[in-house]
Amino acid sequence: MMTTATVLVELLTEELPPKALPRLGETFAAKVFEGLKARDLVAEDRGFRCFAAPRRLAVTVPTVRAAAPSREVTEKIMPVQVALDAEGRPTPALLKKLQAKGIAPEAVASFERRVDGKAEALFYTHLEPGAALDDVLAAIVQEAVKALPIPKLMRWGAGDAQFVRPVHKLAMLHGARVVPGRVLDLDAGRVTMGHRFMSRGEIELATAEAYEPTLLAEGKVIPDFAERRSNIERQLVATAQEQGASLGEYADLLDEVAALVEHPTVYVGEFELEFLAVPQECLILTMRANQKYFPLFDAAGKLLNRFLIVSNMRLADPSNIVAGNQRVVRPRLSDARFFFEQDRKHTLDSRLPRLAPVVYHNKLGSQLERVERLERLAGRIADRLHGDVAAASRAARLAKADLVTDMVGEFPELQGIMGRYYALNDGEGEVVADAVQSHYQPRFAGDTLPAGNTACAVALADKLDTLVGFFGIGQLPTGDKDPFGLRRAALGVLRILIETPLPLDLAALVGDAAEGFAPGLLTAADFESQLLDFMFERLRNLLREAGHAVDVVDAVLALHPTRIDLVPAKLDAVRVFRGLPEAEALAAANKRIVNILKKAEDELPEPDVALLQEQAEKALFHAVVEVAPLVHSHVANEDYTDALCALAGLRAAVDTFFDDVMVMVEEPLTRRNRLALLRQLAGLMNQVADLSRLSA
């Protein structure tokens, strides 16, 4: 049995982009593994280890052969009538083909003859040597490098190599042996480097298996990203507990910091208490975004004047590190305090004229024009909700004013948040201030929704103005490109309508939003219908992701219910109906009715009882007349489950009708009357959902 060993590949680089590091590491490792496996060099699939640190990408793959085993290969040579003459001797065409493939003419005697398609052909079976690791590893690594998700490549030095950052060393080992090869203008070896400051000089790797322990012991580097992240998290949690504090939300920052340090150590820093007079969101953002610090909070979630530093150094006396970080953060906090103090000198109302030169979109006008649309639309929505029209209009008027404040200019992520602080500073009521802050919500999947009718009215106005505006000028999302966030806006509208819930008609809301634009501005043909179709497609995906059955969702949405808040109740009703013994037969009958009615005239009269001839059609007519008031009453009262359950009483009459009655008879009056009866039946059955969409 051929012996196997672990393969190591490491690219030693300059500092890699931190936010891209995990994906770079995972992709590089996976592609190297796939390349080895595709060439049958992996004897036993035990997966692989991925290593990604600020200055290295690496992978180890166990049980790799030095050479893949030979394999039996059968290839078609050519049709017999072309390959052999009448006496069975090789033709010149066959001899030429054999020479090109390096096959001796004597081998023809061993060729197999078999039918291939319509003609008989010659087939040659032979052993093909497997790939040698030494011959292919460099090519595999090069393929992995090319497959990395790198938007921009760079060159360095005098060579032609290109990568996301300069690469200085290449290690390729198979067990204890260096695998020869050249990648990115570098010859493979067994040398790597450790921590930039805590290790000295080059480190020689004895074996591929020794990669991680050698880097840990000699290089002072934790090369495994997940282990490094866990190490940092353990230190952060333990240190926060020692401080009697909590960390708040930290997952995204933890990922970024884990990509910035090789040997993490957590220290505690602090800043002056006076800075806590600044809104804590400002301080938190500047510490996290600019300094990569982890703010600390008390049990109530209030910011403390302490923070955690993840250093790339472990020192017996860290006082200089702590003092240096405290010194660096102070000007940042001072800037935030200055912005806050300056911004409060001017009311949000007084800032509105400064929105006039701020372009929202070159075809949709300025931010000030948009504010005027939002003010009108939010008031209209609040009126539909029988809410506080004045508060909604006022909040919408002020909603974008913080865009021209110093604080939001420095930290765009604080838009809305700072608007609330400044609105309260100006003497606005809590309801208006809260609506100013929350009108951007939900910003992402799972985000909280605005609370209260006023906040919902402003949030809906903001999103509907965006959707109607961009659909109205023909700027629709395409593929994975959505530069104006229209999918996010659509989901926000749907979530607010469903989860709050709000008794608003989506089509009416779209119409209200469209009326706010200047005449002739929205020129795209049929954009309102396009937008509603887009919204229903988003709703379809939203409901499926929530776990609703595909056919149930399709049945409800087939009727384009514009009262989105009622959709969950309709889904529940259809799900209950589907469990009834009569459901399958009624759904099948509904499908049959739909197909029959496709052949009918567009205009059909009400069914005429005098034209009913067969007992079965009379029975169906009377059953429909009897059930219809009950169904209509339940639908009017939004009791959709009872409405659908009432349909169960129609099953016997429907079954008998289709067994005994021919609909498409020659006599036109009878045919039209029976079609009219079926149309009436379909209208009754499909008030809540299109039951023909239900699967068996």
From Swiss-Prot:
Gene3D superfamilies xrefs: Isoleucyl-tRNA Synthetase, Domain 1 (1.10.730.10)
InterPro entries for the chain: DALR_anticod-bd, Gly-tRNA-synth_bsu, Gly-tRNA-synth_heterodimer
Subcellular location: Cytoplasm
GO molecular function: arginine-tRNA ligase activity; ATP binding; glycine-tRNA ligase activity
GO biological process: arginyl-tRNA aminoacylation; glycyl-tRNA aminoacylation
Pfam families hit by this protein: DALR_1, tRNA_synt_2f
Main EC class the enzyme belongs to: ligase
Keywords: Aminoacyl-tRNA synthetase, ATP-binding, Cytoplasm, Ligase, Nucleotide-binding, Protein biosynthesis
Catalytic function, reaction form: tRNA(Gly) + glycine + ATP = glycyl-tRNA(Gly) + AMP + diphosphate
Subunit structure of this chain's protein: Tetramer of two alpha and two beta subunits.
PANTHER family from the UniProt entry: GLYCINE--TRNA LIGASE, CHLOROPLASTIC_MITOCHONDRIAL 2, GLYCYL-TRNA SYNTHETASE
Protein name: Glycine--tRNA ligase beta subunit
Originating organism: Aromatoleum aromaticum (strain DSM 19018 / LMG 30748 / EbN1)
Gene assigned in the entry: glyS
